[in-house]
Amino acid sequence: MKTFRSADDALYRGPKHKIYNTFVWLNKDKAVAEMQTMMFAYHDLDGSTYSRNGWARLLYKVQKTEGIWKIKGLDCIYERDLMIPVTPDYGFDTEIDFDKFRKSYKCISYLFDRGGVPNNNELPGDDKLQLVEALYAEADEWLNTSL
């Protein structure tokens, strides 16, 4: 039983990131890599446990220096997130105004707001395509600029 409990405790430690398909654009000693990512974590709110799941794309800039690939930059493009009760008898406070948060990361914004953490509404996300397009343009320019 103690082993099971230890494994159960480990399940609730911090957020997890699962990285899926990776796309790479290579130009000599530089590359841009985009990775589809799912992030999930458990949160206890008002006596109920919720699973927060988020989907994003991680955009890495990497460069080969002296034969070693090194990360030069990392950006995250948020797609969407959700929170679901771990058991079906839990529910959300219907007074929560989720509309005040951006669609691509409204649940994590709610958790930050609730915890008094400042929320950045200008992160790249699928609900603000101009920010995403600017990020890709900057990565493309970096990739195609010689040293």
Regions picked out by a protein language model, each given a short descriptive name:
Residues 1-39:
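A solvent-exposed, acidic/Ser-Thr-rich amphipathic alpha-helical stretch
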Residues 32-34, 55-88:
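Short beta-strand edge/turn micro-motifs at domain boundaries
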Residues 42-48:
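Flexible, membrane-facing loop/turn or short amphipathic-helix motifs
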Residues 48, 62-65, 135:
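Intrinsically disordered, low-complexity regions enriched in Ser/Pro/Gly/Gln/His and often acidic
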Residues 91-147:
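A hydrophobic membrane-anchoring alpha-helix module
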